[in-house]
């Protein structure tokens, strides 16, 4: 699970959350809480700079094209920033960790995840949102989701 990426490992958190939402089963959250927490710390300690996750392995490698010839375009104006993707996913994981901390009885962690999430969200908007155009980054579909 400890990779230098955020997007794919986020599935680990998402599956636990989906099991809780669909079945009310909190056991996966409780069982894996320490591992979730360790992953958040790993990313923070190794890849967080000025509240932006500065590394992404995969990025937006298969963006929706206007035509099929463009599906694997190498044009940088068509690719979503890996930093944008990783930071957005990291923020989502911090939001989930607030919930997981509460559900697993780790109430002492809730404030940390909330404060971290608030900082990440502010940094994300500061770096990627263009108020004059009303879109994020280079205005790809993925960047604006």
Where are these regions (language model features)?
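Core register positions within helices of long alpha-helical scaffolds
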Residues: 15-18, 93-96, 100
């Amino acid at each position: 699970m400890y990779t230098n990426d955020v997007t794919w490992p986020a599935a680990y958190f998402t599956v636990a959350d989906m099991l809780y939402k669909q079945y009310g089963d909190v056991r996966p959250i409780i069982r894996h809480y320490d591992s979730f927490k360790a992953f958040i710390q790993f990313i923070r300690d190794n890849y967080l700079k000025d509240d932006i996750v500065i590394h992404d392995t995969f990025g937006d490698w298969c963006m929706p094209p206007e035509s099929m010839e463009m599906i694997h375009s190498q044009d940088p104006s068509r690719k979503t920033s890996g930093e944008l993707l990783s930071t957005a996913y990291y923020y989502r994981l911090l939001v989930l960790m607030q919930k997981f901390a509460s559900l697993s009885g780790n109430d002492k962690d809730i404030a940390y995840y909330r404060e971290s999430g608030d900082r990440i969200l502010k940094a994300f908007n500061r770096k990627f949102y263009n108020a004059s155009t009303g879109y994020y980054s280079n205005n790809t579909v993925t960047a604006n989701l």
